[in-house]
Amino acid sequence: MRRQVVLGTGILAAIVALAIVLFVARRERTDPARCPAGLWAQGPRCCGEGQSLAGGACSGVPTRCPDGLAPRARGCVAVPRRVRILGGTLTLSPNDWEAEGIARRTITVTEFEIDAFEVTHDRFGSVGAPEPGLPVTSLSAEAAEAFCRVQGGRLPSADEWLFAATGISARRFPWGPTGLVCRRATFGLVEGPCGTGATGPELAGARPDGKSPDGVLDLAGNVAEWAREPNASARAHGGSFRSRVAGELKSWSVEGGESAADHVGFRCAYSPTPH
């Protein structure tokens, strides 16, 4: 009898523990604090305040959006702007790269401009996109470059992209040396520390706490971004919503493939405008 009582008590304790875990997990997934100011949690997503979730997409006219994003008829959208990067010389060494086997080299970048935000469906003119503020993905580097040419720009070179993310101080993350948290970068959404069950990126520019000192957003996470390598090939930089570990989000993170993918987007770079 005593064994039955102990066994029954153990089962009850396990059920209670499981219920607590499920409650906490559900609360974290719907906790408004996980979404930046101007957005609120709707299931696995962060939608503009006043919106609801329909078919996995944020729907309705938002009453409020994060700083830098404007309310539109179908959601919050980043207002395109360019950021001037003054350029300079960046020396990379094994210490800068945490002894990851990267050879010491020096990068010199001249002044250029770069989009503050990833290119969105609204800016791209996508037809039938469920949310205009989401970044464009599943586009080849050539198609992305063609769009940038129409805008008077091009894809950034790998060195330009790196310099925009690290600055001359070789920042580990675009905002600084530490502090990779969910409020600064959109990562690990599918599976990982910021997991909500989402299956795609968040709104471009929705994490203002993760911007670089120059004011460039989403250089870590959300979508990886095309940049041109010295041999004219293209590779995706910076990690994405699928990235699960810090090493995939650091400023020097580069993916090996050259194919279009649902976690790869882009932004454009430009020659500097006259002062």
Which ranges hold each PLM region?
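Extracellular, cysteine-rich, disulfide-stabilized repeat modules with beta-strand cores
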Residues: 39-42, 51-54, 69-71
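Short, hydrophobic alpha-helical membrane anchors of single-pass surface/secreted proteins
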Residues: 4-10
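A short glycine-rich, aromatic-capped structural motif
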Residues: 74-142, 221
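Short, structured beta-strand segments at or near domain termini in extracellular proteins/domains
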Residues: 263-275
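Disulfide-braced loops of extracellular cysteine-rich modules
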Residues: 33-36, 44-47, 62-66
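Hydrophobic membrane-insertion alpha-helices, especially the h-region
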Residues: 10-21
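Functional-site microenvironments in short loops/helix caps that host divalent-cation chemistry
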Residues: 85, 91, 130, 137-262
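Ser/Thr/Pro/Gly-rich low-complexity linker/stalk segments immediately outside membranes or between
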Residues: 26-38
